């Protein structure tokens, strides 16, 4: 497991297993926000929060764009969502075991009992209030709608008491909203079994080898089953992957879904990742149908000696993969990109021995952190950070023997700066030039490591002093 994943989680995405949470507009969750909603006037004032007085942050402009008092927010693309409680204070997220690994907010608001809150939609660049929505809820959390569109979900629950013979029953209503506060879809979940909300679907464990994907807003459920004798598959909300033995991939990516074949220790064939059409189940791509990249060890029959494989990303007709290098090279991975239509490898490949950390609670072996523009990737190798180009696998730079090994955390909004930690800097972070490795700052407080706002290119930090938004450095 890679040490950087634990560090990233410590600095702070998906949704929790908490049932019986939600929102309601009036008495009914998911109801059109007629009385509880208001569109902000065109002359709505900008945010008037504190002035940032912390250290300069490499990768961000010197002057903040706007700020608020202490708060956390859900990034909805061009909008930030804040939750204001009945006491008038902004909610602070984090603390959920299922929060995203990238440090962004997953669970923003959660209480044992429903209560009134105000949802506040602010423009990322100016801080101006675009809309407010009053609801009564127990839970507000980040999610995604179809094709990865940023969204948030609210839940409400009701309990049917036993009549003396029947069992007590719980119904949870889940409503998903978009960045403009409009309802995208609603669903109900019966019982108290755990579930997740992802890509416009309810994700549930149907049995040991099967996940059930139920479209929110209507539609036939789809079952994703991993193959193999006594195969086991599960969904991890922290990185949105399907986990099947030594095979890992995004459960849903756009119009596709993945499952794992030979996902069992009882299988002799290596794990196979299969991508299928989400609507029809028709196979679109399989790792078994492409040639493993150079550097992957094969036996005398041409079969991979390691079953470890993962899909890191699918976009623009390309699939980024990571392959276990060999049966006895458990921490060494080879990364390669394939054309979806032809199955041919695009560009070269990278081969690195990754830093292993047994304390990891999530499987991210062979993973890297990506710049927001997906131009660069940074891997946590045995000698420290290595940066490489996603397009062709070309190495940009790598730490040398004798240097203090840096574990990469994330890139700046413009991709120009890489932030990371060393064993000697648990509470502070290094900031280095992503292209040259030049150290820009060696003691940035961990709370001041910025997150990247989707689409806008702005960066933001949430500290005890406030919530601060900055343009990217020019």
Regions found by a protein language model. Give the residues of each.
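Short coil/turn segments at the loop-to-beta-strand junctions that recur within blades
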Residues: 68-75, 134-141, 183-195, 226-233, ...
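Acidic, serine/threonine- and glycine-rich low-complexity intrinsically disordered segments
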Residues: 200, 207-213, 217-388
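Short, solvent-exposed loop/turn segments at conserved positions within beta-propeller repeat blades
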Residues: 108-116, 160-171, 204-208, 264-270, ...
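N-terminal low-complexity, Pro/Thr-rich disordered segments
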Residues: 18-71, 82, 474
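Short loop/turn segments that connect beta-strands within beta-propeller blades
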Residues: 124-127, 178-182, 215-219, 277-281, ...
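Blade-level signature of beta-propeller repeat domains, shared across WD40, Kelch, NHL, RCC1
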Residues: 435-474
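Blade-loop segments of beta-propeller domains
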Residues: 123-161, 172, 183-191
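Blade-terminus and WD-like Trp-Asp/Gly-His loop motifs, strongest in beta-propeller folds
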Residues: 74-77, 84-87, 99-101, 141-149, ...
């Amino acid at each position: 497991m890679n040490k950087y994943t634990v560090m990233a989680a410590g600095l702070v995405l998906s949704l929790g297993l908490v049932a019986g949470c939600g929102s309601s507009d009036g008495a009914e969750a998911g109801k059109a926000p007629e009385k509880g909603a208001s569109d902000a006037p065109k002359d709505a004032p900008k945010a008037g929060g504190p002035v940032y007085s912390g250290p300069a942050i490499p990768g961000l402009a010197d002057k903040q764009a706007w700020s608020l008092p202490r708060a956390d927010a859900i990034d909805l693309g061009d909008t930030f969502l804040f939750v204001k409680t009945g006491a008038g204070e902004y909610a602070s997220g984090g603390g959920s075991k299922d929060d995203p690994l990238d440090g962004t907010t997953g669970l923003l608001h959660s209480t044992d009992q429903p209560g009134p809150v105000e949802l506040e939609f602010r423009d990322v660049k100016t801080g101006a209030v675009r809309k407010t929505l009053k609801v009564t809820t127990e839970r507000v959390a980040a999610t995604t709608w179809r094709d990865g569109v940023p969204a948030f979900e609210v839940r409400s629950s009701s309990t049917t008491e036993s009549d003396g013979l029947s069992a007590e029953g719980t119904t949870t209503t889940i409503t998903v909203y978009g960045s403009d506060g409009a309802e995208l879809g609603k669903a109900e979940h019966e019982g108290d079994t755990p579930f997740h909300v992802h890509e416009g679907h309810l994700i549930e464990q149907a049995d040991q080898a099967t996940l059930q994907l139920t479209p929110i807003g209507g539609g036939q459920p789809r079952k994703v089953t991993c193959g193999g004798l006594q195969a086991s598959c599960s969904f991890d909300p922290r990185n949105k992957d399907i986990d099947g033995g030594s095979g890992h991939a995004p459960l849903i990516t756009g119009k596709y879904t993945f499952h794992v074949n030979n996902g069992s220790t009882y299988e002799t064939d290596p794990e196979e990742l299969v991508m299928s059409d989400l609507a029809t189940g028709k196979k679109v791509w399989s790792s078994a149908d492409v040639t493993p990249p150079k550097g992957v060890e094969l036996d005398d029959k041409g079969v991979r000696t390691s079953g470890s494989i993962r899909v890191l990303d699918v976009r623009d007709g390309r699939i980024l993969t990571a392959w276990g290098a060999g049966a006895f090279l458990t921490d060494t991975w080879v990364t390669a990109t394939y054309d979806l239509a032809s199955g041919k490898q695009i560009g070269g490949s990278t081969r690195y021995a990754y830093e292993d950390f047994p304390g990891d609670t999530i499987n991210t072996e062979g993973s890297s952190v990506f710049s927001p523009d997906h131009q660069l990737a940074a891997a946590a190798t045995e000698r420290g950070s290595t940066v490489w180009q996603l397009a062709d696998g070309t190495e940009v730079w790598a730490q040398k023997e004798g240097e203090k090994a840096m574990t990469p955390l994330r890139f700046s909004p413009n991709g120009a700066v890489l932030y990371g930690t060393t064993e000697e800097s648990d509470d502070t972070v290094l900031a280095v030039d992503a292209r040259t490795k030049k150290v820009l700052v060696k003691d940035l407080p961990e709370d001041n490591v910025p997150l990247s706002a989707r689409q806008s290119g702005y960066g933001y930090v949430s500290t005890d002093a406030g919530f601060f938004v900055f343009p990217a450095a020019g």
